[in-house]
Amino acid sequence: MDIIKTTGQMQQWSERVRKQGKTICLVPTMGYFHDGHLSLMDAGRTQADHLVVSLFVNPIQFGANEDLDAYPTDHDRDFKLAELKGAAVVFAPGPEELYPPGFQTAVTLSQLPLHLCGLSRPVHFQGVATVVTKLFNIVGPDVAVFGSKDFQQLQVIRRLVKDLNFNIRIMGCPIVREADGLAMSSRNLYLSADERNSALSLSCSLALAAEMVQAGETRCRPIIAAVEKFILGHQGTQVDYVCLCDPLTLEAVDTITSPVLLALAVQVGTTRLIDNQVIDPEQ
């Protein structure tokens, strides 16, 4: 496995691979791998001849007072895990490599970031869209794999690829959970034992909402109220949002007549966690 840290070397590697008639799958990450990341690599390895994993904690997707400086890193461990998963390359540039002095370009979307996480993290999706565009241009993948825990990010990237005519297939993979249901996240490391117990309220509240819909409730307001009440009944929780929305546009709905996305963002102690589930009233 190669570890590449400059854009020029990454582009040269990709050009050489394409000249050989081989395909590339990219798994973009911010590192500190858990089983969710590893499942993306497993999926990506089946989609192309070569797997490239990018490892970059993207500073421009963090707002003021967010956890950029505290975000966990262990590159040596990540390199070993990526190699075990069959990665041909880990692309691990530093911030100055992707954002050199004078950098002034940003990629923005006009509608999708106006919902869910975008309301409380106004710079986040501009940062995501910008770095993903750069990674696509540098690596030149045929396929890119993303997890669906950040469902909004997945939809932003799908729209980005469509709108900017990238010839890249986007593959979304299911959320990977701990045995007790907690969605895997690098930020789970921040949680104390008590906070981790409270964090289980997210996945349990998704199940509660699904049960209400299966029992015939189609009005969104009582479902949202029940979910918020359940989460806030756990110590140290603050709800950022609970939203039932259209899975494509992310616009909130009032009544459930077709599959909807239930998306949550909750502060547990000092840690912000997200989770989601698509709920189908016909099932």
UniProtKB/Swiss-Prot annotation:
Record-stated family: Belongs to the pantothenate synthetase family.
Subunit annotation: Homodimer.
Organism superkingdom: Bacteria
InterPro entries: Pantoate_ligase, Pantoate_ligase_C, Rossmann-like_a/b/a_fold
GO molecular function: ATP binding; pantoate-beta-alanine ligase activity
Keyword Lipid metabolism listed: no
HAMAP family noted in UniProt: PanC
Record field: catalytic activity: (R)-pantoate + beta-alanine + ATP = (R)-pantothenate + AMP + diphosphate + H(+)
Assigned EC number: 6.3.2.1
Localization, UniProt: Cytoplasm
Protein keywords: ATP-binding, Cytoplasm, Ligase, Nucleotide-binding, Pantothenate biosynthesis
Residues binding (R)-pantoate, per UniProt: Q61, Q153
Phylogenetic lineage: Bacteria, Pseudomonadati, Thermodesulfobacteriota, Desulfobacteria, Desulfobacterales
GO cellular component: cytosol
Main location: cytoplasm
Species for this entry: Desulforapulum autotrophicum (strain ATCC 43914 / DSM 3382 / VKM B-1955 / HRM2) (Desulfobacterium autotrophicum)
Pathways per UniProt: Cofactor biosynthesis; (R)-pantothenate biosynthesis; (R)-pantothenate from (R)-pantoate and beta-alanine: step 1/1
Protein known as: Pantothenate synthetase
Keyword Ligase: yes
Record gene name: panC
